[in-house]
Amino acid sequence: MTTARPAKARNEGQWALGNREPLNPNEEMKQAGAPLAVRERIETIYAKNGFDSIDKSDLRGRFRWWGLYTQREQGYDGSWTGDENIEKLEARYFMMRVRCDGGAISAAALRTLGQISVDFARDTADITDRENIQYHWIEVENVPEIWRRLDAVGLRTTEACGDCPRVILGSPLAGESLEEVIDPSWAIAEIARRYIGQPDFADLPRKYKTAISGLQDVAHEVNDVAFIGVNHPEHGPGLDLWVGGGLSTNPMLAQRVGAWVPLHEVPEVWAAVTSVFRDYGYRRLRSKARLKFLVKDWGIEKFREVLETEYLKRPLIDGPAPEPVAHPIDHVGVQRLKNGLNAVGVAPIAGRVSGTILLAVADLAQQAGCDRIRFTPYQKLVLLDIPDDKLDEVVAGLEALGLQSQPSHWRRNLMACSGIEFCKLSFAETRVRAQGLVPELERRLADVNRQLDVPITINLNGCPNSCARIQVADIGLKGQMVDDGEGGSVEGFQVHLGGSLGQDSGFGRKLRQHKVTSDELGDYIERVARNFVKYRGEGERFAQWAMRADEDDLR
């Protein structure tokens, strides 16, 4: 009788276990040359010699660490999406992402963002659901001048993309909200100062998303690491630590570590969590390299043990969980601030603005004495410090720009990714489609809009990567090519229903074989919204209703 040998553990490329040999092309690229070092080549070689001079490993790899992706070549529908068509899909222009840690900028910075758009990006500008600004049509020759202008107002594109710490989400009303438990602005600024652009964390296994807020207004459940305000019964205000969230093709909600962290320790604890990811994260398969996979395999108890014993060298303080919220906190509308002034939050459709609009908003802000502008994780824009005697003027001025502070449910609660207009991964048009879909829904569902006392969130994404968080929307729409009924395929969406964060956190449900074409979106959303109003129970939220509703009412 022979005894079977135990299976040898697969090498997942974990540095802490001595596995430094790169196991995929992306890891090979990083080992061959530090991605952050490409900035010098951009400034001294590529910007001078043009697009054709760019080395492919820089173009498709290291450029990301400076917020640059090539955008999609025009004229190719979703049937062309895929790595095998990269040579056709790769345009000679770039998407550039500007990170705004905490979503916070000054009026001067907003003006600079607007002018860069007008001068170099064909007047494009989109507010993302990570509080960034994204440009399109950027030429490599203009990148050094754009960087110079951003540097002058305290903004940067450093690590806005790539396997590194992305922009840090923060509350748009941090320090001024009457509802926040604590103002963590110092921690956000300190993490950005100490660690962003530094080599220690510039080579992580995969992207790494952070959210820090005294309110639950940053979608913390879908971030790799998050600190959320909570009151400890003995120690007072602090932050509750969460790890391992993320969506894409394997969605997972973050888990509570069960630790209360005082404000002054947040940067240290953030660095320790990031170090665990850097050293133990999986580097073999890109599709399983996010922190969430390590947390899932280890379990939260082991994660906390390693964090405390190997990195912090001390135990964390046990703490209570924050009370989950019923609905997204998007800061749209007029709110009174701690300082006695007002915040005005507005809802551009799916975050789409323009350089011209940003310049006009900067004018309005400066005329009202406002020097604090915020972007939100829901693709919204907020102006702080508006005095009472300027409030009507600012609200009217924003309204004239198409930026409503009292929008319909459909305008307020719809988000979208870049879509096939610019993204090489997309199968469907999303942000552009949203510009027509929202007015259509406002016309068709004006009566429902008046009846609704709860939001219905609608998130459009062009591919499975879920940049627009489809799995946690009431109605999530994932772009794909769908059967046209005549043996061909057309642009369409797979439907996810009843996803939510907060009280009903979860990914909802998919209906078997249920897909809609892009042309059917208005009809489908109207049908489901009317069924919700007709069949919901007293006080019932959409996510609750969708989980119990008959399939026929959801189709």
From Swiss-Prot:
Family matches, as InterPro entries: NIR_SIR_4Fe-4S, NiRdtase/SiRdtase_haem-b_fer, Nit/Sulf_reduc_fer-like_dom_sf, NO2/SO3_Rdtase_4Fe4S_dom, NO2/SO3_Rdtase_4Fe4S_sf, NO2/SO3_Rdtase_FeS/sirohaem_BS
Record-listed [4Fe-4S] cluster binding positions: C417, C423, C463, C467
PROSITE patterns for the chain: NIR_SIR
Keywords: 4Fe-4S, Heme, Iron, Iron-sulfur, Metal-binding, Oxidoreductase, Thioether bond
Domain of life, per lineage: Bacteria
One Pfam family hit: NIR_SIR_ferr
Residues covered by region (Disordered): 1-31
Reaction catalyzed: hydrogen sulfide + 6 oxidized [2Fe-2S]-[ferredoxin] + 3 H2O = sulfite + 6 reduced [2Fe-2S]-[ferredoxin] + 7 H(+)
Binding site for siroheme: C467
Record PANTHER family: FERREDOXIN--NITRITE REDUCTASE, CHLOROPLASTIC
Assembly, per entry: Monomer.
Protein function: Catalyzes the reduction of sulfite to sulfide, a step in the biosynthesis of sulfur-containing amino acids and cofactors.
Family under the similarity heading: Belongs to the nitrite and sulfite reductase 4Fe-4S domain family.
Protein name in the entry: Sulfite reductase [ferredoxin] 2
